[in-house]
UniProtKB/Swiss-Prot annotation:
Function in brief: May play a role in anterograde transport of membrane proteins from the endoplasmic reticulum to the Golgi. May be involved in invertase secretion.
Subcellular location: Endoplasmic reticulum membrane
Its membrane topology: Multi-pass membrane protein
Location of the region described as Disordered in the Swiss-Prot/TrEMBL record: 142-171
Membrane spanning residue stretches: 7-27, 46-66, 111-131
Additional note from the record: Present with 2840 molecules/cell in log phase SD medium.
Spans within the Cytoplasmic topological domain: 28-45, 132-203
Protein name, per record: Endoplasmic reticulum transmembrane protein 3
One GO BP: endoplasmic reticulum to Golgi vesicle-mediated transport
Pfam families with a match to the protein in the record: Bap31
Protein's gene: YET3
Length: 203
């Protein structure tokens, strides 16, 4: 394996290690500092430019490998078509198949490295988003279930009063708005109960 493909393999090993760290079921108190530690070097503009250059170089290697596999296939077909000397053809065929094997290996190596790069970047984004949502949830004041029920009862009474006024004054628009507010309050209460259950499962 040449030097640049050895470097590509080293990059692939690093990406596999980072993806494994992100995918492991680590508790939140350890996951956040570990994720920030892994993400810290990539915040530098110099590192970002270097990564883009390396990815561009790997992409060129990937395209070159595809072109090489295609040309070797054509050469293999031509060598199979011409069967003048059996011993020479067999020896040439082994050499061509060997070059095809190495070209396919390099193509798979560069291709999976590019694919795993995008997977790791997307996984980083999802983990950071999850940690941010957890921080927002923990920073928000807890809402008691009694307060939620009280708000629901107040909204229901307001809707009932609005229905009475609708019959008396024909204010349909006000009645529809209060009904929408009641539906939104019910949805908020349902989401809060769901988030509390999820938080209990996480902790």
């Amino acid at each position: 394996m040449s030097l640049y493909y050895t470097l590509v393999f080293a990059i692939l090993v690093v990406e596999i290690f980072m993806f494994s760290i992100l995918a492991l079921p680590i508790p939140s108190r350890y996951r956040r500092p570990l994720t920030l530690l892994l993400l810290k070097p990539f915040k530098s503009s110099t590192v970002q430019v270097a990564i883009k250059c390396v990815l561009g170089f790997i992409l060129l290697l990937f395209i070159d490998c595809i072109n090489r596999v295609y040309s070797i296939d054509k050469e293999l077909q031509l060598s199979s078509a011409s069967q003048n000397n059996g011993a020479i053809i067999a020896q040439d065929r082994i050499e061509v198949l060997s070059r095809k094997f190495f070209a396919q290996r390099n193509m798979y190596l560069t291709g999976i490295t590019l694919f795993l790069t995008f997977v790791v970047v997307r996984t980083f984004g999802l983990v950071i988003e999850l940690l941010t949502m957890k921080d927002i949830y923990r920073a928000s004041p807890p809402v008691a279930s009694s307060d939620v029920k009280k708000n629901d009862s107040v909204t229901a009474e307001a809707a009932a009063q609005s229905g009475a006024s609708k019959d008396d004054h024909g204010d349909e628009k006000n009645f529809e708005l209060l009904k929408k507010i009641q539906d939104i309050d019910d949805e908020i209460a349902r989401l809060k109960e769901k988030s509390e259950s999820l938080q209990e499962e996480i902790n």
